[in-house]
Amino acid sequence: MSEKSRNIASALFPLGLLMIAMISIQSGASLAKSLFPVVGAQGTTTLRLVFASLILVAVLRPWRADLTAKSLRTVVIYGIALGCMNLLFYMSLQTVPLGIAVALEFTGPLAVALLSSRKPIDFLWVTLAVIGLLLLIPLGTSAAAIDLLGAGYALGAGVCWAAYIVFGHKAGADNGVQTAALGVVIAALFIGPIGVIHAGSALLDISLIPAALGVAILSTALPYSLEMIALTRMSARTFGTLASLEPVFAALSGLVFLHESLSLTQWLAIGAIIFASIGATLGSANSKPQLVPAD
């Protein structure tokens, strides 16, 4: 295999990981909504993070991480951002449709891509992603029905998502995939009290375990491990642009599971976002980012 082919393959590998992660997250979001009537968004977030932390600690063995005082601070911020991102996103799903919530949340990683851009070609990919998002977001009568508080929660989740990308990139560079386990444990400790206050003893209902475990695996354990591997193999800027696929998967999830039809304009939007993601990925192949072993 030539050097150029290896560079392209190296760039496409994290893209594949992110696609699997996003499919998993969308499936988990659908399952999570079934828990809202019982324990609310706060309790669902707590169950998700607690079960996910148990899984990731067992699989990734984070005690092997060599933490310094500086790297510990980064991991703590990463974990808090992760927890708040989960909580605010679920809060938004109580009143805002999945596709719209994801599109609003995406303002976070898009901001990372914009602020991190250095070459003119980067702005082309970001511009394409923005155009696609604007076309995907339902304006008209659908937008008039959007709950403003729910939209605010989604935008807040976007801010946390941006912090998750930036600090996850730094933390992952130091400790690899162990960072995912450490981050989820910190997130569970930070969000847990909120869930307990809101849901109380309902969190101890053993009948919720199968659904909660499914949400933990689909929405946290699997995708965040894959994302952490991807974050160690690409720049924060590239990750932010590639994350534009998230609202695309949300729209497709609505089509498959909720039978929501898409207009020609929305399909064109999906094409624009995918093209932007591919362009950003192939562009990163020439930058030769430093790879960090995933252990």
Give, region by region, the residue ranges found by the protein language model:
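Transmembrane alpha-helices of multi-pass small-molecule transport proteins
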Residues: 14, 37-84, 111-112, 160-164, ...
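Hydrophobic/aromatic residues within transmembrane alpha-helices
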Residues: 35, 44, 48, 92, ...
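Hydrophobic transmembrane alpha-helices of multi-pass small-molecule transport proteins
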Residues: 77, 107, 121-140, 157, ...
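Transmembrane alpha-helical segments that form core, pore/gating elements
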Residues: 56, 112-113, 140-199, 291-295
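Hydrophobic alpha-helical transmembrane segments of multi-pass membrane transport proteins
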Residues: 19-27, 31, 59, 76-91, ...
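C-terminal-most transmembrane helix of multi-pass membrane proteins
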Residues: 2-3, 7, 49, 208, ...
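Specific alpha-helical transmembrane segments that line the substrate/conduction pathway
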Residues: 43-53, 82, 89-120, 157, ...
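Juxtamembrane helix-entry segments on the extracytoplasmic side of multipass membrane proteins
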Residues: 9-15, 38-42, 46, 67-72, ...
